[in-house]
Swiss-Prot record:
This is Iota-conotoxin-like M11.5. One of its GO terms (molecular function) is toxin activity. Expressed by the venom duct. InterPro entries: Conotoxin-I_CS (IPR013141), Toxin_19 (IPR012624). PROSITE patterns: I_CONOTOXIN (PS60019). It comes from Conus magus (Magical cone).
C-alpha cells in the first residue's frame, strides 16, 4: 500500500520513492542507513 512519508507527506509505494524513507517515516539519504530499505511498504 501507500503511506505518507517524509516532510512533504508524499505518497510512496517504495521506500526509495521519497529519499529512502525508513520504517519510522523519516527520510534518510541512503539505504545503507539502519532501517532503510527499497522494499515495498505493506
Amino acid at each position: 500500500g501507500h503511506v505518507p512519508c517524509g516532510k512533504d507527506g508524499r505518497k510512496c509505494g517504495y521506500h526509495a520513492d521519497c529519499c529512502n524513507c525508513c520504517l519510522s517515516g523519516i527520510c534518510k539519504p541512503s539505504t545503507s542507513w539502519t532501517g532503510c530499505s527499497t522494499s515495498t511498504f505493506d
